[in-house]
Amino acid sequence: MRIEFVDGSFVQEVKDLPLWEPIGEGDATAIRNAYQDSGVLVFRRQALSEDELLAFGNVIGAPELYAEATWRSTLPEVNILSNLRDQDGDMLGGLANKPLTWHTDQSYYATPVTGCFLYGVELPSEG
């Protein structure tokens, strides 16, 4: 595993680490430290099941259930955000095409969450 800053930014990219495999404590500590240092980590080209996604999320820290979430996967810790529709025209996830401004989820908690883990399945080529 390698962790490198993305050129000209505060973002760090974690390379050569298949997240679908168990992560050793040494790599887990390095990932947590990198997150504390920069606040944004990128893991490219991962193909994860929901169980694998949750297992990796637990490497970073215990997940917080988001009470207002209306688009849950089969796991209560995983919420689906999407602007896609199924063949019947029903939304596949929350938010749709609603405009959003920058915000932090659950920052109003007495002890705010540490961060948010986003897993992109279909992404635009830019933007």
Which role fits each region the language model picked out?
Residues 2-127:
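Fe(II)/2-oxoglutarate oxygenase catalytic core
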